[in-house]
Amino acid sequence: MLDIKKIKEILPHRYPFLLVDRVISVEEGKKVTAIKNVTANEEFFNGHFPEYPVMPGVLIVEALAQTSGIAMMQSEANKGKIGLFAGIDGCRFKRQVVPGDQLLLEAEITRMRGAIAKAKVKATVEGDLVCEAEIMFALSDLPQ
């Protein structure tokens, strides 16, 4: 399990764009399961939509990409790197995410060759599928 302090050591994202609150399981270099607690105080609800708050789908995908980043960085070979979003396939949204929901974020690295990685990702709320996709990343060194 990784708390927010450990997550910040792995990911370069910060408020308001750090979208992973806690990691609950890790299979080193392979799979990560994480949580995003969606609260009424999220900055994006000010405009999406004030009278009918719904978490934007692109931010659900970003939370899944960040979860994938944590999974990729668990591999010793990828320490000090960043996974840059390079593509997405088969993305489908099945349910809205609203204040009070807890997103369960799952990312499994399915391919890692050179500087290219792919992850199969899934987000659920209380067992209901919210989003699934396959995301591709280009690994790059972090600037010193």
Curated annotation (Swiss-Prot):
InterPro entries on file: FabA_FabZ (IPR013114), FabZ (IPR010084), HotDog_dom_sf (IPR029069)
Compartments, as annotated in UniProt: Cytoplasm
Keyword Cytoplasm attributed: yes
GO terms, molecular function: (3R)-hydroxyacyl-[acyl-carrier-protein] dehydratase activity
Catalytically driven reaction(s): a (3R)-hydroxyacyl-[ACP] = a (2E)-enoyl-[ACP] + H2O
Keyword annotations of the record: Cytoplasm, Lipid A biosynthesis, Lipid biosynthesis, Lipid metabolism, Lyase
Catalytic class of the enzyme: lyase
Lipid metabolism in keyword set: yes
UniProt-listed Pfam families: FabA
One GO cellular component, as annotated: cytoplasm
Signal peptide residue numbers: none
Main function: Involved in unsaturated fatty acids biosynthesis. Catalyzes the dehydration of short chain beta-hydroxyacyl-ACPs and long chain saturated and unsaturated beta-hydroxyacyl-ACPs.
Protein name as annotated: 3-hydroxyacyl-[acyl-carrier-protein] dehydratase FabZ
Provenance organism: Listeria innocua serovar 6a (strain ATCC BAA-680 / CLIP 11262)
The encoding gene: fabZ
